[in-house]
Each structure stands twice: as C-alpha cells, then as structure tokens.
Amino acid sequence: MRGIILAGGSGTRLHPLTIGVSKQLLPVYDKPLVYYPLSTLIMAGIRDILVITTPADAPAFRRLLGDGSDFGVNLSYAAQNEPEGLAQAFLIGADHIGNDTVALALGDNIFYGPGLGTSLRRFEHVSGGAIFAYWVANPSAYGVVEFDADGKAVSLEEKPKTPKSHYAVPGLYFYDNTVIDIARSLKKSARGEYEITEVNQIYLNRGQLSVEVLARGTAWLDTGTFDSLLDASDFVRTIELRQGLKVGAPEEIAWRAGFIDDDQLATRAKELLKSGYGHYLLQLLDRE
C-alpha cells in the first residue's frame, strides 16, 4: 500500500497565520501538524509516502521531513499548483500509487486512540474503498454519512445544510487501485473541486464501500480553525503531561514498528536534545 499526505491548500480560514507558512507546518503543542498524519500512516504500516504541498511550501516540508529516513519511510514530494479538491490527490499521485492500493491522510487531521495501528493495518489489501464515521456536534462542516436501521451506509453528502446524521467522515481514506480511474472520471463540483465525497459515492453505488464507525475513546481532531487548532494542542498537551508519553511522535512509532532500529533512534534523538524531544526518544531506549 502507498500513502499520500495532502498538505496543500491555502489555509484561508487560518489567515493571517497561514499567509507566510503552510497550515500543516503550524505547531500542535510540541510538534508540527504534519507529524500527526505521518504518524497515522506509519501506524498503518505504510512505508512509501507522497507528500503533496503547494509549490511555495515544498522547500519547508523537505527541510522538515527530508527523504523520510529519520522515520524509516521513503518520502517523495509533489506540487498541488491550485487547490482543486481532495480527490485531486489521486490525479497528482497516480504515478506514485502505480498498481498498488492507497491510503490518503489529510495533513490537518489528527487521530488518537487505543489499538489504532492494529486497526488500520487491516486495510493494506483493501478491496473497494474503506472510510470511517465519527459522531460530531456540527456535521454541516464535514462530509456526512447516513446509516440505515441495520447500520449500513446508505448516503453521503458534502457539507450539507440539513445533515441526515451526525456522522462525519474523517480525513483518512483507504482505496484499491480503481480510485485512480474514478478520480479521472470526476467533474468539478459547484465549488470548483474534485470532491472526495463523490469518489466515496461511486464506491457506495457499486456496493464496494466499507464505512466503519470509529470506536468510542478514539479522538479525531480537525485543525482547520483557530479554536480547533488550539483545542488540538490542549488535547495533546494534556495527554503528554498526564502520561509522560508522546502523541504522534513518528520516530517512536517507526521504532516500535521496526522501521528504524535502536541506533537510528538514538542518532535522531541526539539531533533534538535541546528541546527535550530528543531526551524523550532516548528514554524510550532506556525503558524498553
């Protein structure tokens, strides 16, 4: 399976913060935002990842993430010249995907919960599409999925004014290779975008879409507004101070997955000692 992190867009809802820097490079407590979706893909066992950014932001992402070797993955980069919808990621990333399955993680979404990594690895050989549903108070801000009395998904809508349910679709999607042809067949919506909801609707119409409700106790944080960005930082800070364990540290997750060894973790840690982040990584070696 190949991975894609979509970290483009103009971030207008966060202006003036994002006039000079990509939204996905903003801090969420002690880490840049993009570390969290990167961690999610590593938890899913994915080692070949394409990072899609704006042309202007590409150098900063390369400086931060490099070739991925610090995290035991292979990172490549592509430019999204104009933000034309989430499904555009499959057009930009078609060569990266090749004949493989693919996971798309939105660069501003954070996932946290018990057993998340084990759960995500199930989709490595996905047939059709697999998405998630998460109960939210304000579904009109998201893509919304409706279930029938038997818990079967029956409809999908993108940011509806009158939602048919409170179940939003988070920014993590798994697809088989058909998604490339589906994306190529799309026409732009009234918003001028290639909609991910339409991709999911096509899979649903074919009877090939799995929709799984995220378990209670799993947190999904969307950081697209000032308040949600601050809420995400507060959430991460609270857990880390309470437990003494990092949330969304890709080096730790890669090490636990066997993507990097003890020596590689120690080398990375020594580069980050002054902030305390490196000390945390070194302590992992002492604890285990």
UniProtKB/Swiss-Prot annotation:
The gene is rmlA. Gene3D superfamilies: Spore Coat Polysaccharide Biosynthesis Protein SpsA, Chain A. Pfam families: NTP_transferase. This is Glucose-1-phosphate thymidylyltransferase. Transmembrane segments: none annotated. Mg(2+) binds at D108, D222. Pathway: Carbohydrate biosynthesis; dTDP-L-rhamnose biosynthesis. DTDP-alpha-D-glucose binds at G8, K23, Q24, Q80, G85, D108, N109, G143, E158, K159, V169, D222. Belongs to the glucose-1-phosphate thymidylyltransferase family. Its EC number is 2.7.7.24. It catalyses: dTTP + alpha-D-glucose 1-phosphate + H(+) = dTDP-alpha-D-glucose + diphosphate. Binds 1 Mg(2+) ion per subunit. Catalyzes the conversion of glucose-1-phosphate and dTTP to dTDP-glucose and pyrophosphate. Involved in the biosynthesis of the dTDP-L-rhamnose which is a component of the critical linker, D-N-acetylglucosamine-L-rhamnose disaccharide, which connects the galactan region of arabinogalactan to peptidoglycan via a phosphodiester linkage. Keywords: Magnesium, Metal-binding, Nucleotidyltransferase, Transferase. GO terms for biological process: dTDP-rhamnose biosynthetic process; polysaccharide biosynthetic process; rhamnose biosynthetic process. DTTP binds at G8, G11, T12, R13, K23, Q24, Q80, G85, D108. Its cofactor is Mg(2+). InterPro entries: G1P_thy_trans_s, NTP_transferase_dom, Nucleotide-diphossugar_trans.
